[in-house]
């Protein structure tokens, strides 16, 4: 079977990591012929010398970042498809902005178009809201008209997306840690935090609006006032200039690492006490699984998407309340029994997620089913599966 893996739309964030993980596993899981379309950012992450002869890579010059770029992208991808004549196209994360002739499977991870009750919509400006609605129109149109089958990462998203796009087949394959977390020989120890006895909260993320990290200065102020003498620090994987509202008063409680590579992350978690994520919108943040994998507490927003993923393996707070967040942080740092319970629950919850290998196998099963049977139903793959059968 000839399969096009379309990663031309993957340019930022966790999509880069997930795509790299999937491609790495495909090297050993499948004998299909893979034609891989790469964005410039994705191409920089791929060591093509590691891939066998059934992989062919194409650097896609056009970008989906503008209307003109999307027109060029459609022409470029269509020309390649005519030459390759694939059986199936799998766009790892959409919207694809392109309708191939072959059967088309596409990943969906646009939480902002489904969780309309999110407090995210309370913190954005009118201009941002109008721009988001415009993007939503074009993005949903592409998912509806350019894709035959959609793939999401949680049951919650599957249910909401099937309501948004009735009649469209939607499959679910859970997100998971990159396979580098499974092999300590591949860990990098270049990012070393200053030695400290402070309770260390780690956030592995860019400073996107929906991550709600701008609340951190207010949380610092609350903790300093409410719990004098409590030693804590936030470790953030971006630059200090990107976090709004920071003054000299906040700096002793902040450490900025700058952008980190995936190989840096396991050792970075080892240097932290908890993973902190006050996010307002997610489909499935891989940070949850990473923290559980590294046996670290999860402190996150009390919102449905977070509870759907973490269940009883996280300490939840109101993400718009600095008091609620601060109290949760202090409780996590001082309640030893709570810590042990959360870590135990995290280890148990982690067993329910797929491994990187199982996730890739699940994607391949969907690709094969769509090619061989034209399967139109929807199903859910989250628990352990038989990757050989």
Range-by-range predicted roles:
Residues 4, 192-211, 217-220:
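Conserved donor-binding/catalytic core segment of Leloir-type glycosyltransferases
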Residues 55-56, 244-266:
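Nucleotide-activated donor-binding/catalytic signature segment of Leloir-type glycosyltransferases, i.e.
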Residues 77, 81, 267-272:
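Short alpha-helical donor nucleotide-sugar binding micro-motif in glycosyltransferases
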Residues 128-150:
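Membrane-proximal helix-turn-helix segments that form the acceptor-binding/catalytic region
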Residues 280:
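Aromatic "clamp/platform" in nucleotide-sugar-dependent glycosyltransferases that forms part
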Residues 293-300:
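Short hydrophobic beta-strand element within catalytic cores of glycosyltransferases
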Residues 300, 315-323, 331-336:
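Conserved acidic donor-binding segment of nucleotide-sugar-dependent glycosyltransferases
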Residues 337-379:
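A charged, aromatic-enriched C-terminal amphipathic alpha-helix characteristic of glycosyltransferases
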């Amino acid at each position: 079977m000839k399969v096009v893996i379309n990663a031309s739309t993957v340019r930022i964030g966790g999509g880069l990591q997930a795509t790299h993980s999937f491609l790495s596993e495909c090297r050993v899981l499948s004998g299909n012929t893979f034609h891989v379309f790469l964005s410039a950012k994705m191409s920089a992450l791929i060591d093509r010398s590691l891939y066998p002869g059934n992989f062919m890579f194409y650097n896609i010059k056009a970008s989906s970042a503008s209307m003109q770029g999307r027109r060029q992208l459609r022409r470029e991808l269509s020309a390649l498809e005519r030459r390759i004549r694939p059986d199936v196209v799998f766009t790892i994360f959409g919207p694809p902005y392109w309708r191939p002739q072959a059967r088309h499977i596409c990943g969906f991870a646009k939480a902002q178009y489904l969780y309309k009750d999110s407090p995210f919509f309370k913190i954005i400006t009118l201009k941002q809201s109008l721009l988001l609605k415009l993007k939503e129109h074009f993005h949903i149109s592409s998912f509806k008209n350019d894709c035959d089958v959609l793939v999401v990462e949680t049951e919650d998203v599957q249910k909401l997306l099937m309501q948004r796009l009735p009649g469209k087949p939607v499959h679910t394959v859970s997100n998971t840690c990159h396979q580098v977390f499974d092999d300590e020989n591949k860990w990098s120890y270049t990012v070393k935090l200053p030695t400290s006895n402070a309770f260390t909260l780690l956030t592995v993320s860019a400073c996107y609006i929906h991550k709600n990290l701008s609340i951190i200065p207010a949380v610092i102020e609350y903790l300093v006032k409410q719990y004098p003498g409590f030693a804590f620090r936030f470790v953030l994987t971006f630059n200090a200039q990107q976090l709004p509202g920071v003054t000299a008063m906040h700096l002793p409680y902040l450490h900025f690492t700058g952008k980190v590579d995936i190989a840096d992350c396991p050792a970075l978690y080892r240097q932290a006490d908890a993973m902190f994520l006050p996010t307002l919108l997610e489909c499935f943040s891989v940070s949850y699984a990473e923290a559980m994998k590294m046996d670290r507490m999860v402190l996150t927003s009390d919102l449905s998407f977070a509870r759907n993923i973490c269940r009883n393996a996280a300490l939840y707070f109101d993400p718009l309340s600095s008091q609620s967040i601060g109290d949760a942080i202090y409780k996590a740092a001082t309640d030893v029994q709570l810590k042990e319970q959360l870590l135990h629950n995290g280890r148990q919850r982690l067993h329910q997620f797929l491994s990187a290998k199982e996730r890739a196998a699940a994607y391949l099963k969907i690709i094969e089913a769509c090619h061989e049977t034209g399967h139109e139903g929807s199903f859910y793959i989250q628990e352990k599966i038989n990757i050989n059968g």
